[in-house]
Structures are given as C-alpha cells and as structure tokens.
Amino acid sequence: MAPRRRKAKRRRHTLRSECKDKCKCHVQCYVSPRKRRRKLKPQGDDDINTTHQQQAALTEEQRREEVEEEGEERERRGEEEREGEGGEEGEGREEAEEEEAEEKEAEEEEAEEAEEEAEEEEAEEAEAEEEEAEEEEAEEEEAEEAEEEEAEEAEEEAEEEEAEEEAEEEAEEAEEAEEEAEEEAEEAEEAEEAEEAEEEAEEAEEEAEEAEEEAEEAEEAEEAEEAEEEAEEAEEEEEEAGPSTPRLPHYKVVGQKPSTQPGGVPKLCLKMQPQHRSRLPKGKQSHDKVPKKYQARNKFFSQAAPSVLDLSPKSWCWVVDFWGPTDALYRLSRSLSFPGAVSSGIQTFPKGPHATGPWVYFITVYCRTFQTAKEVIKAQKKYEKKYPRSAKLKASLGKFSKSLPIE
C-alpha cells in the first residue's frame, strides 16, 4: 500500500495585524476586496447628477472632519509646548506663523476646489440643456411623424371607401347575374319538366308492354305447370305399376379442366341435364352457352399457371404483380406474351379452400432480367400519368400494352 502524504495543518492567525485584511481568520473584522473597491453607484431612479452631489457632500464632510482633527492636534501640541518649553516664545511664534500660512494654503486649496466644483456643475447644467434641446427636437420629429401617419390613415380610409364602392358595384353585378341565372334555371326546369313528361309517357308505354309480356309469361308458366303435373301423374302411375329401370344422373361430364396447382389432378366439367326434377332460379342456367366473344376469356380464367413456375427461380426471379378488373388483366396478360416476361393466369386473393370474399383479382408477371421488370413498371407509371382516370387499371389496358417493350 502506497504511503499517503499528510496535508500540513493550516495555522490560524492569532493577531489581526498578521491577517492584513487578506484572510478570513477574524470574520467579524474581514472586509472583502470587492466591497473595498466598490464605488458609489446610482440606485433606483437616481440620475448621475444626484450621485455627483452625494459624492461632493461626502467629500465636504470629510474635509470638515479633517480640519477639526487638525485643529485639535494643533491645540494639543500648543499646550504641550507651553508646558514643556515656556522660554521659547520666538519659536512658538514662528510655528504659529507657519501654521497660519498652512491654514491659508489649505483655504486657498479649498477655494480652488470649490471653483472646480462650480465649473463642473456649470458643465453639467450645459449638458442638461443640450439634452433638453435634443428631447425637444425628438418631440418635434415625433409630432411630424404623427401628422404623416394621420395623413396616411386618411388616404387609406379614402382607398377603403373606394374599395367598398367597388365591392357594392360588384355585388350589384353579382345580383344581376344571379337573377339571370335564376331565369335560366327556371327555363331549364321547364325544359326538364317537358322531358320528364315525355319520359313518363314512354314509361307508361313500356309498362303496358311489360304487362303484356307478364301476361304471356303467366300463360306459359301455367302451361309448364300443367305439363309438370301431367309428368308427375305419369311417374306416379309408373311407380304404382311397379319397379322401373334406375334413373339417369342429373349431371353429365362434358370435358376436363386443368388443375390450379402444377401437376394436380384435372377437374371434371359437369353439365346439368335439360330434363330434371330440381327447379333452378330464373335467369342463367348451367347449360346456357357462353357467347363467342367471351369464350377465349373464359378459357383464360380457368387456365393454370404457366410452365415458368417449373423452371429454376434464379432465371425468373423478378416478379411484378398487377391488380385490377378481370377484363383489363386478360388484355394485359395477352400483351405480355414475349420471351422477356411471362404472365400467370388470373389469380384471386385471399387464397385457400376456406377463404371468403370479396375476391380481388391479379396476375403475376415473371421477368427474366431486372431491366425487363423495370421497363414494365416504367410503362405502368407512364400509363398512369397519361390516363389518370384509369390509373388503377380500372379501364382497358390496351393503350398500356402498346407502350410495353415487346420484342
């Protein structure tokens, strides 16, 4: 363990003369140097003139005290000299003369100091007069500025009055325009009423036609019900007669549909028999044919993902998804059939066997290079800027397909 050096104990001064006002041993006698050199400063709202007067008054009091002390010392010395040296009167006279001369010199010095103080007071008065003159000039300038501001305010008021008059004129013009607009609106309402009357007449004609069609449908329905009742009666008669051959199934296989997963089992396409006992709701039925212009699109919706999924993911690692309505996605997929990019079939989100709607349709575009994917996205952005109303592929993407980098 390293030896520790003891601190030397501080010696406390016993006498005040040893401190010499430099330490705090005698606290009751200590005066800090900051207080010793602090000068008299104006306090509160006092100005510098009152401060000078206070300083001058203090110096005069000090002088009086000094003069009184000197007089007392002289008297004491005179008494001592008279007691000790009675025979030396000549010397006493000389000393008295010297003292008188010193007193005269002191009085002359006091007179000179009084003159200097008077000169200082005169200089201070002159400075005060100059300050008053400057204040008067400043007041005159302020008065001139106030007059200028009043003149400017008067001008602004005049401008405001003119603006109010203009606003009133504009309001009158606006009222006239409103009256004209009301007249035009009344004319337009009259024209609309005439159109509504025509539409009501047309609707009445359509209702009459619909009533006729409903009457015809009711007759057909009655005939169909009668036919069904006859068929049921015939079946009941057959059942009563005895066991018959097994019934044909209600559905028949008309083709195969590829699986949605690669390498999956193909699904069977079933078609409902035209004659069956189960009743379907009115409207489209399962055996209705798809119009020719939608056949290719219907095939596209049911097709599987492209064979690009079986390839290595490194060569087709750049993927771009496009969302939107089915018809727009169909046209986009047709336009992306070139070597640089391949699009998948229509897909739905959310996926899964137990997923519930609403369905969102999208296609995935697999690009071979990053540059191709970049060009596809760039073309999409260009299409959004050029056709802002169909920015989210709500309209047909034929214009968009023209801007793609098809080789």
From Swiss-Prot:
Coiled coil (residue ranges): none
Keywords in alphabetical order: Early protein
Chain intervals for the UniProt region annotation (Disordered): 34-268
Single GO MF annotation: DNA binding
Segments of skewed composition (Acidic residues): 81-241
Domain of life according to the entry: Viruses
Keyword Magnesium: no
A Pfam family matched in the record: LANA1_DNA-bd
One GO CC annotation: host cell nucleus
Family per record: Belongs to the herpesviridae ICP22 family.
Name of this protein: Transcriptional regulator ICP22 homolog
Organism classification: Viruses, Duplodnaviria, Heunggongvirae, Peploviricota, Herviviricetes
Gene: 73
